[in-house]
Curated annotation (Swiss-Prot):
Key word tRNA-binding present: no
GO biological process terms held by the UniProt record: cytokinin biosynthetic process; cytokinin metabolic process; cytokinin-activated signaling pathway
Protein name in UniProt: Protein SOB FIVE-LIKE 6
Organism for this UniProt entry: Arabidopsis thaliana
Classification of source organism: Eukaryota, Viridiplantae, Streptophyta, Embryophyta, Tracheophyta
Keywords from the UniProt entry: Cytokinin biosynthesis, Cytokinin signaling pathway, Cytoplasm, Nucleus
Length: 177
């Protein structure tokens, strides 16, 4: 394959090389404060200039007709204004929600939830209370039914007597019912 006839393989400068070459050859004007003269220097150090691109330079030569530009701009502005109105409405709704539920004086750690969340909070509290009551009654029944081997606990809590009283109480209830 012969690469000599391809555009990007010629020895010409790429876009970066031409840009960097132009920027490095710009003449600099300095004012000498001691003599009051303006000196012109040429910076021709090309050691930092490199050809970073291997392809041909690309130039944008397309012209945009003014009519198309105006039409696109008008369409864009109209669509943006419609979106702004929707966004404003959404922001107002969100602000109203946050104002109802978040007061700057409320402490979120100690304050109760407001609105629909209150019923969920109460329901959760009720479930927790039922669980807590169940645990206490279960552990009380367990203590009453088991024999305790410690002499101190037997003196402080006559477990056998409590267990017998509870059993006797159950029998009395059955007889009444």
């Amino acid at each position: 394959m012969d690469f000599s006839d391809l555009d990007y393989s010629d020895a010409g400068d790429s876009g970066w090389t031409m840009y960097l070459g132009h920027s490095s050859s710009v003449s600099l004007h300095h004012f000498d404060y001691h003599n009051g003269e303006t000196k012109q220097e040429h910076d021709e150090d090309s050691s930092m200039v490199s050809d970073a691109s291997s392809g041909p330079p690309y130039y944008c030569e397309e012209t945009v007709h003014e009519d198309h530009l105006q039409q696109n701009t008008q369409y864009w502005c109209k669509s943006k204004s419609k979106n702004k109105n929707k966004n404003k409405k959404k922001v107002h709704e969100e602000q109203g929600y946050s104002e109802r539920f978040n007061s700057s004086f409320d402490d979120t750690a100690s304050s109760l939830p407001v609105g629909e969340e209150v019923s969920a909070h109460k329901q959760h509290q009720n479930q927790y209370q039922r669980f807590h009551d169940f645990c206490q009654s279960y552990s009380t029944r367990r203590i009453c039914k088991e024999k305790v081997n410690s002499g101190f606990l037997q003196q402080a809590f006559p477990v056998d007597k409590l267990a017998l009283d509870n059993q006797g109480g159950d029998n009395q209830r059955k007889r009444r019912g």
